[in-house]
Amino acid sequence: MNKVLITKLIIVTFLLSTSAFAANNHASNEWQIDAYSSAAPSFIGDFATIIGGNGEVIRKGSNGWTCQAGNPRPFPKNGWKDVHEAMPACSDKEAVKWMMAYMAGKKPQLDNDGWMWMLHGDVGEDNLKAGVLNKKDSTPGQWIESGPHLMLMPKDPSSLDNMNADFSNGAPYVMFPKTIWAHVMIPVNGYYKYQKESEPIK
């Protein structure tokens, strides 16, 4: 009887330790699924396909949306240090096309406008010039480390040519204006938490 009880305790301890390891192992499928799916509201993220850091599907979805890390830097061996660094994005099928084209340095070919959620924000972009990964290399005054936001990827980026490009007034604005990657940034609550100095002042 005691042997059975001890065996059960060993099994439970093993399962709990394995679960805790997976939760703390940022390269694990479990961590990535939880982190990337939370880039969108749960009614989208919970049913989306999840792409892991090595490019493989780690969970097949059912709603046509795809969530994955948006950080263009190489996937670290031990995973991203936190969900903000991962820059996860949840995209509809048109926004997936946009992301793939952007990562490849090509012009997006969309059938219609696309939508992308990034509720954990990003680690910083030059608002005027695509592909700048460090603040020191950015256009003066144009670096923005975003908090939670939604993005609209237009089929025709030139339709945004006359749109506001100022990220400091709280309104939706265009990022990468007058380029093939122009898109609308729609700030939501908490957008300025990583860059307080850009928040509108009362």
Language-model-derived ranges and their functions:
Residues 9-17:
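Bacterial N-terminal signal peptides
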Residues 2, 20-21:
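Hydrophobic alpha-helical packing segments in soluble, helical-rich domains
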Residues 1-10:
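Bacterial N-terminal signal peptides that target proteins for export
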Residues 23-202:
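Primary mode marks residue(s) on the alpha4-beta5-alpha5 output face of response regulator receiver
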Residues 5, 14, 25-28:
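Intrinsically disordered, low-complexity Ser/Thr/Pro-rich tracts
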